[in-house]
């Protein structure tokens, strides 16, 4: 694909949105393949009966409260999974026994067409999507009625009890709302090749946006400019936008995990935590980079302080070692524990943590003291949602149960797969690996106030040393990783480490 360069003027300064080294993009490329019906078949195979009707509504147009303006449209992900349809006000049914996928599109509305353009029609939908039949919405009620009358003993599978199709109240329908979500989650957690390509494309857009920010960072005075350029590049590359609210936290704001105000000046601050990911065809990327603010660096150095460099190096080690452990059959919670083990080792070396007289390292583990600085899970599933669905939990593995009983591991659980009962990683899963270390003033002050209590984390903290690191704020590094049979594949190409620093300083 041919690369290209576009420059824009920001606050009187020429900004190159696509610096040298950015991945080229073919903006004319379209995602021509739609696996919706294959997904419907996969879901049906997980249901308790191989007969029945699956019904799913798409996202309907909804007005904001006390307004005539529609809320921003986001397609329901379960509906999208079996249709590939990104238009509002649609519905779908899948007759399992007949292997028949029927899409229902909005009835034609002449007035609406004049104002907003034509809605998705039957002919267009038949050409664009892998469905067997397309009807207008007005046909849905009669179709469901006739199917139910012909199959009175078979279930209509629905996702939630409040997502039933509109049907006559005088007719009894056999709705089943317990099985479909479990079946769809089991399918969604294992990505097929098409889904992997979409996640990788979202990552390519994210990588280009992160690269652009690093190359132009010396121009920026405010967090808003960082967040704004990220969205600018995503939209320019035909992404519909970001998969979640951008986090562009400078200084102490980087110690707030989901900081989204993005409106404070960069002056006088050391680091930025930028957690920002593009979406492509409803699939998410989730990428975090932490980098120095050039105006805070002097004397030919790369880092604003020795403390910032040290914390970045620790988090970099945490991520590299954890990614190397990602493979099929591995328990992700064990990898999460390894990240905490590295944090414990390195924070003891820096003197941030201490082992008081009469205590042992095991006491620090039991107190979960590293959670004061690393308070979140190592990662989560990624797919149609940034925090994507997970498979059903199983029993806690024996080896983890023994370690927990002996006090040899942290027992704090987070979002799956960062739980004791999460099943092992499987080929086709896409997970994030996002270790971080944070110096959150509120958390530190609370630990200091409780340090004399018998079970407190503060007993093991050198607060005088911690004060030297507070201005770092936080450091998080996050990549999206595909689990494979023989290891893993990192889908994220946003610069980090030396490549990141070279871009910032124009080397």
Curated annotation (Swiss-Prot):
Alphabetical UniProt keywords: Aminopeptidase, Hydrolase, Manganese, Metal-binding, Metalloprotease, Protease
Cited Pfam families: AMP_N (PF05195), Peptidase_M24 (PF00557)
Cofactor field: Mn(2+)
Record-linked SUPFAM superfamilies: Creatinase/aminopeptidase, Creatinase/prolidase N-terminal domain
Biological-process GO terms, alphabetical: proteolysis
Keyword presence, Protease: yes
Family designation: Belongs to the peptidase M24B family.
Chain positions recorded as Mn(2+) 2 binding sites: 275, 286, 478
Enzyme Commission (EC) number: 3.4.11.9
Coiled-coil regions listed in the entry: none
Protein name as annotated: Probable Xaa-Pro aminopeptidase ARB_01886
EC top class, as a word: hydrolase
Catalytic activity: Release of any N-terminal amino acid, including proline, that is linked to proline, even from a dipeptide or tripeptide
Example of a GO MF term: metalloaminopeptidase activity
Purpose of the protein: Catalyzes the removal of a penultimate prolyl residue from the N-termini of peptides.
Annotated PROSITE patterns: PROLINE_PEPTIDASE
Binding site for Mn(2+) 1: 286, 434, 478
Textual note on the cofactor: Binds 2 manganese ions per subunit.
